[in-house]
Amino acid sequence: MTAPGLTAAVEGIAHNKGELFASFDVDAFEVPHGRDEIWRFTPLRRLRGLHDGSARATGSATITVSERPGVYTQTVRRGDPRLGEGGVPTDRVAAQAFSSFNSATLVTVERDTQVVEPVGITVTGPGEGAVAYGHLQVRIEELGEAVVVIDHRGGGTYADNVEFVVDDAARLTAVWIADWADDTVHLSAHHARIGKDAVLRHVTVMLGGDVVRMSAGVRFCGAGGDAELLGLYFADDGQHLESRLLVDHAHPDCKSNVLYKGALQGDPASSLPDAHTVWVGDVLIRAQATGTDTFEVNRNLVLTDGARADSVPNLEIETGEIVGAGHASATGRFDDEQLFYLRSRGIPEAQARRLVVRGFFGEIIAKIAVPEVRERLTAAIEHELEITESTEKTTVS
C-alpha cells in the first residue's frame, strides 16, 4: 500500500520539514537506509530489526502510573479515536510501534485541575532478548496543570510513541528519563500538540542503554503557545544517544526555547564503538506564524578520546515578521583556562574537572521542577565522572 505523498517524502521534496509524510501504516514507509537523511547518524545494524519489520513482539513492557487526585488512567485498544491526536508517525519505526502495540496507556488531567504532586509513570522494558512496542498519551485538559515524570527501567528492545496533548491554557512539564540497562535498544517518537496560550516544558534525560534515539515533533495549534525543550545526556564507551527535534511554529505569537547539553567519554583501548551522541534540531517558522520568538542551543563536552558528537541545528523561516530567531551549537573539550584558574587556587585537577562538568549541566538541572529528579541526575553525573577518572588512570598506567 502506497499512501498519498509518500513519493514526495522519499525524494525529499516536501516544501518544509513540517510537511514530511506521516502515516500510521508501516507499509507506507520504505525500509530505512544509512543514506537517508533522518537515519544517516543512526547505527541501523544495532537496532535489532526495529527498522525493517523483522523484530516481532516477543514480550511486553509494563507501564505503571501513580495515583493522583484529578488524574485518570485508562488502558485502550488501537482503535480508540483519541490516539494520534498528538501527532502521526513520520518514520517507519514509529509506524511499526503504532501497528504493533497490544494496548495503549492514556493519562488524563481533568479540566481546570492543578495536580500538586508529580505524576510518576514507570516503563519497565520487556527484558533481555525480548522485543516490545508501546504507546502512551498524556493529556492536560483546558486550564489544567501537571508535572509528569516518565521513567524507563529494565532492558530489552523497545519502540514506542508518546503523545503530549496540551489543551488551551493548560500547562505540562514532562520529564522523560531513559535510564536503561546497558544492553537496551529504545527508539521513541514523541508527538506534542500545544493549544492556544498553553505551555509545554519537555525535558529529556539519556543515561543508560546501548542505542537510545528520541525524536520529538512539537506543533503549535493556537496563538500564544510556549514550548521549552531541555535535554541532558551522558554517553559512555559504546553508547549511541540520539535526539532529533522539530518545533513547528504554525500560529502567531508563539515562543520556543531549546537547550540540550551532553557529555561524552570513551575508551580508545576498548573494542566497543566510540561513544556517540547526535543532536538534530529543526525549527520551522511558517508564513502565518508572525510574532514568533525562538532560539535553540546545543552544547557538547568531550571528556576523553574515543568519543564523537554530531550536532546539526536547522532553522527555516517563511516570514520576516518575527520577534527573533536563532541557533547555536558548540562541541569541545575542557576549557583549559577554567581548569588553570581552579588549579591555581589549590583545587586538584580531578576535582576541578568535576566542578567544570557540574557547572556545565547545572543550567539544565536547575530548570527541572522535581527535586528528586535533580538529586538523581546530580548523583548520576558524579558516577559518570568516577568512570572518567578510572579510565584516565588506566590509560596512564
From Swiss-Prot:
Superkingdom in the source lineage: Bacteria
Region forming the signal peptide: none
InterPro entries: Fe-S_cluster_assembly_SufBD, SUF_FeS_clus_asmbl_SufBD_core, SUF_FeS_clus_asmbl_SufBD_sf, SUF_FeS_clus_asmbl_SufD
S-S bridge residues: none
SUPFAM superfamilies per UniProt: Stabilizer of iron transporter SufD
GO process terms (BP): iron-sulfur cluster assembly
Family: Belongs to the iron-sulfur cluster assembly SufBD family.
Entry protein name: Iron-sulfur cluster assembly SufBD family protein Mb1497
Source species: Mycobacterium bovis (strain ATCC BAA-935 / AF2122/97)
